[in-house]
């Protein structure tokens, strides 16, 4: 059996070029994702500041995801992704300069997180909509799964490389991790110049000048209201995005405080922080590989449900855990469950929505997940600061569990889709 038989998206030269370049870039991104919150916690010692950075990074999604979804449908998606990737590269190099020069302050991190979030709010929608233009609809589920695979493989490699850099470079490891992220963007940007989109709708730019954003957004909302399955997926995504998904932002506080040992040094805490991110990445990678290899499975709703309930239950268990090895296992399962449910949500939406509405509907889904996240980040950060990190995990996990039970009992269409 050829690789392209199991992974049909790899039969596309254009997708493969983009896929490889993005993998290198995502590895750098996860080096920054591991380093930035740890640096912020080292500067302030505040769980609330971790939530504030999450708020700053995700607020642009609340503001831009919906109009961005309309605009993306009228723009060249490949060129849009290139522009946003360049902005993200500049952000990484600015962070590197500030950290290496010793000028870094917490307000720099918050402001640059907002800049990164602004680019991400548009780039994610454009990139997801570009996938079908690279591979066509038959190979789309596999392309989505392969995208998630490299994202989560990068979640493993990024923290591992970060740990090595922080151990080897005594005083400026964070700055060099940011610099490596900036360099990594060159690979995906360069690759995109060699990529073509053979399945693209060439009429996307014809009506850009006459685009009526409120009217077109309303068309997307009408479709969602008339499709109960898509509506429920978006509602669940929003609830989890507020009470559950922001918790991993507290990993530096877990590494430093919840798992504190009498023999701790800065290097030990740094290594523990990287290990927790690594564990989450391994769990996420396992989920992505499974879904990639078996993207043809019909019962996608079942895996979504298992991932949702596992995520909420594990979050509750995290609240009662002080053992380092067991915490590593739980964080790994947290990564697996989070990726499983989000990949299935993404796939169900991409397959169920017509081409003409995909950008708008996906932007609503993205808004549901990340648009509410700024306030979820503040809530979880405030709760962790006021009551404790374990208490924040307990409240978030319990509320997610209660909502999932209610939704699955109240709306039988979910059970019908799962079976």
Question: Where are the model-predicted features located?
Answer:
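Intracellular juxtamembrane helix-capping segments at the cytosolic ends
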Residues: 36, 122-135, 340-353
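Transmembrane alpha-helix termini and helix-breaking/packing motifs in multi-pass membrane transporters
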Residues: 38-43, 96-101, 157-180, 257-261, ...
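Helix-breaking motifs and short loop linkers at transmembrane-helix boundaries and internal kinks
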Residues: 44, 76, 98-99, 103, ...
């Amino acid at each position: 059996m050829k690789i392209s038989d199991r992974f049909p998206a790899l039969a596309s030269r254009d997708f493969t070029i983009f896929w490889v370049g993005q993998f290198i870039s995502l590895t750098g991104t996860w080096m920054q994702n591991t380093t930035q919150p740890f640096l912020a916690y080292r500067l302030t010692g505040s769980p609330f500041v971790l939530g504030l950075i999450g708020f700053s990074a995700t607020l642009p999604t609340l503001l831009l995801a919906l109009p961005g979804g309309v605009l993306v449908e009228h723009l060249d998606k490949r060129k849009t992704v290139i522009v946003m990737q360049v902005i993200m590269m500049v952000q990484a190099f600015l962070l590197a300069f500030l950290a290496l020069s010793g000028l870094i302050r917490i307000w720099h991190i918050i402001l640059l997180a907002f800049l990164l979030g602004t680019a991400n709010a548009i780039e994610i929608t454009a990139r997801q909509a570009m996938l079908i233009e690279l591979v066509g609809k038959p190979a789309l589920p596999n392309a989505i799964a392969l995208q998630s695979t490299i994202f989560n493989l990068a979640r493993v490699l990024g923290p591992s490389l970060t740990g090595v850099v922080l151990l080897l470079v005594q005083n400026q490891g964070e700055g060099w991790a940011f610099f490596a992220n900036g360099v990594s963007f060159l690979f995906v940007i360069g690759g995109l110049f060699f990529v073509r989109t053979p399945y693209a709708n060439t009429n996307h730019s014809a009506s850009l000048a006459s685009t009526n954003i409120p009217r077109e957004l309303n068309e997307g909302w009408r479709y969602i209201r008339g499709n109960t399955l898509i509506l429920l997926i978006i509602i669940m995504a929003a609830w989890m995005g507020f009470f559950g998904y922001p918790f991993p932002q507290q990993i530096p506080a877990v590494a430093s405080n919840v798992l504190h040992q009498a023999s701790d040094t800065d290097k030990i805490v740094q290594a523990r922080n990287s290990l927790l991110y690594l564990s989450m990445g391994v769990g996420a990678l396992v989920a992505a590989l499974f879904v990639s290899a078996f993207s043809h499975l019909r019962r996608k709703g079942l895996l979504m449900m298992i991932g949702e309930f596992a995520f909420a239950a594990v979050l509750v268990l995290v609240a009662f855990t002080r053992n380092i090895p067991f915490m590593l296992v739980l964080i790994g399962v947290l990564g697996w469950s989070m990726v499983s449910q989000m990949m299935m949500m993404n796939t169900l939406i991409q397959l169920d929505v017509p081409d003409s509405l995909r950008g708008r509907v996906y932007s609503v889904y993205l808004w549901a997940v990340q648009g509410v996240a700024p306030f979820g980040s503040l809530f979880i950060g405030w709760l962790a600061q006021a009551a404790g990190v374990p208490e924040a995990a307990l409240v978030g996990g319990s509320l997610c569990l209660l909502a999932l039970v209610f939704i699955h009992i109240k709306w039988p269409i979910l059970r019908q889709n799962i079976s």
